[in-house]
Amino acid sequence: IGDGCPGGENIEILWQCGKYYKAGTDEFMAKAKAEGLGGNTLKFIHYSDFIGRMDLAYAMADVVISRSGASTVSELCAAHKAAVFVPSPNVAEDHQTHNAMALVRKDAAMLVKDAEAQEKLLAAAISLVNDNERLEAMQKNIAKLALTNAAGDIAEYAYKLIEKQ
């Protein structure tokens, strides 16, 4: 952000920073603005500790940068949103990396390791936003992974099990 995000001059960022990081984010943004960091970039960053209508946030997004918990991965598949996943290193059995890699292998998402995020994440996201062909391919590929009738499928399977008894 400090260098003005080359290539991202017209990208709007909606950032859910979380309640534990809100004060630090406020401090960072205030300091960056006071020191003139980021040029015009900071005016395109909108942040909050919590987004109450994630469906609307997904609807307006071209690319989503996110951790890769199972619920989030499912939501992004259903929303047909290209994603750059940053798996949390603080979860059991590194399951978020496994979740993300399932999509990366299908060219439906990108992965940036948490330890490399500060160095590589912004460039990866900006590159994806500015590559319409890759972005569209990822959106199509992630859409193919959506299980849009999962609840109905589970219910149908349960009924079949009941009928067998």
Predicted feature descriptions by range:
Residues 148-165:
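C-terminal alpha-helical cap of glycosyltransferases
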Residues 1-64, 97-100, 112-121:
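Donor-nucleotide binding loops and adjacent catalytic segments primarily
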Residues 54-96:
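A donor-sugar binding/catalytic signature common to diverse glycosyltransferases
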Residues 125, 129-132, 154, 158:
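Hydrophobic "lid"/C-terminal helical patch
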Residues 134-148:
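A short, well-ordered alpha-helix in the C-terminal region of glycosyltransferases
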Residues 19-20, 88-92, 143-144:
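Short histidine/acidic/glycine/proline-rich micro-motifs that form metal-
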